[in-house]
C-alpha cells in the first residue's frame, strides 16, 4: 500500500530529488512580487506548502508533480481553491505549450536532480515565462550567475545569460527543508532578456564546441575550417589567438559566431 493510501505522510524520495519546503518566510521570498494578474508555473509542488502561498497571491497556479504519492496531500493543501490546476507529469517531458492560459511566472522549489536542464529548457521553449524565481542548490545558482574567468563559468552560464539576467536573490539554510539537504541552497531570480540573439541555436552549438576541452585554446576546439577564422575573429574582439572559452563573455560568443559563420 502506498503511503498516501495508508494515511501516512509520504516520505521524500531521494531519486526524485525531493526536499520539501517547510518554512513560511522562505515561501514568502519565493512568492514575492506575484499578483492576481500572474499565471504561475510551479514544478515539484510536493506536499503543497509553497503552492498554498502562491495560490494566495496569483490568479492561477499550474502545479506539475511527478510523484503520485504526494498528490492527496497536495490536494488537501490547496483545499477548495479554484485557482490551482494540478498536472501529474514528468517536468522534463511535459508539454508546457499545452498550458492554458500560458504561465508568465515560474515560482518553485525545484527538484535538485533536474533543476539545471529544466531551467534552460524553460528559457528555450516557454517564451511566455517572463520572470522566474526558484530555489536550487547554491552550486547551480553560482553556475548560472558566474562571470567570465571564474571557476564556475562555463557553457551553462553562457546560455542562461544569453536568454536571461540571473541573480542570486537569497541564500537558504538547509533547515528550511524536510529532509535537510547536505548542500546549501539559494533563491535565484531570472528576468527573460528581450534582446536574446535570434541566432541562439547556432551560438549554442558554438558554445558547446568551445567548452569541449577547457584546457585547449578556443580555436583548437572548433572544426578545422573554422579555426583560422576563429583566430582572426578573436583578435577583432580584443582577444588573443590563445584565448580560452572561459575568457569570453556571452556577448563575445554571439559576435564570434556571427564573424565565423559562412
Curated annotation (Swiss-Prot):
It comes from the Bacteria. Its EC number is 2.1.1.182. Belongs to the class I-like SAM-binding methyltransferase superfamily. rRNA adenine N(6)-methyltransferase family. RsmA subfamily. Residues 218-246 are annotated as: Disordered. This is Ribosomal RNA small subunit methyltransferase A. SUPFAM superfamilies: S-adenosyl-L-methionine-dependent methyltransferases. Its main location: cytoplasm. It holds the Pfam family RrnaAD. The keyword Phosphoprotein does not apply. Specifically dimethylates two adjacent adenosines (A1518 and A1519) in the loop of a conserved hairpin near the 3'-end of 16S rRNA in the 30S particle. May play a critical role in biogenesis of 30S subunits. GO terms for molecular function: 16S rRNA (adenine(1518)-N(6)/adenine(1519)-N(6))-dimethyltransferase activity; RNA binding. It is an enzyme of class 2 (transferase).
Amino acid at each position: 500500500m502506498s503511503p498516501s493510501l495508508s494515511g501516512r505522510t509520504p516520505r521524500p524520495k531521494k531519486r526524485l530529488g525531493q526536499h520539501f519546503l517547510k518554512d513560511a518566510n522562505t515561501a514568502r521570498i519565493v512568492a514575492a512580487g506575484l499578483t492576481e494578474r500572474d499565471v504561475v508555473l510551479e514544478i515539484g509542488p510536493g506536499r503543497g506548502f509553497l503552492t498554498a502561498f502562491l495560490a494566495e497571491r496569483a490568479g492561477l497556479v499550474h502545479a506539475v508533480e511527478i510523484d503520485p504519492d504526494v498528490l492527496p496531500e497536495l490536494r488537501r493543501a490547496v483545499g477548495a481553491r479554484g485557482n490551482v490546476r494540478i498536472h501529474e507529469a514528468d517536468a522534463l517531458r511535459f508539454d508546457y505549450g499545452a498550458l492554458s492560459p500560458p504561465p508568465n511566472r515560474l515560482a518553485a522549489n525545484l527538484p535538485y536532480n533536474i533543476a539545471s536542464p529544466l531551467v534552460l529548457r524553460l528559457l528555450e521553449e516557454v517564451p511566455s515565462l517572463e520572470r522566474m524565481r526558484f530555489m536550487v542548490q547554491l552550486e547551480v545558482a553560482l553556475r548560472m550567475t558566474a562571470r567570465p574567468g571564474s571557476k564556475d563559468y562555463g557553457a551553462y552560464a553562457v546560455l542562461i545569460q544569453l536568454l536571461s539576467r540571473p541573480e542570486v536573490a537569497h541564500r537558504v539554510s538547509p533547515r528550511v527543508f524536510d529532509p535537510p539537504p547536505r548542500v546549501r541552497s539559494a533563491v535565484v531570480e531570472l528576468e527573460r532578456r528581450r534582446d536574446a540573439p535570434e541566432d541562439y541555436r547556432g551560438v549554442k552549438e558554438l558554445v558547446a564546441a568551445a567548452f569541449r576541452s577547457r584546457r585547449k585554446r578556443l580555436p583548437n576546439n572548433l572544426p578545422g575550417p573554422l579555426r583560422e577564422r576563429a583566430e582572426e575573429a578573436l583578435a577583432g574582439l580584443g582577444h588573443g589567438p590563445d584565448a580560452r572559452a572561459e575568457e569570453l563573455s556571452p556577448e563575445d560568443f554571439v559576435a564570434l559566431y556571427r564573424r565565423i559563420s559562412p
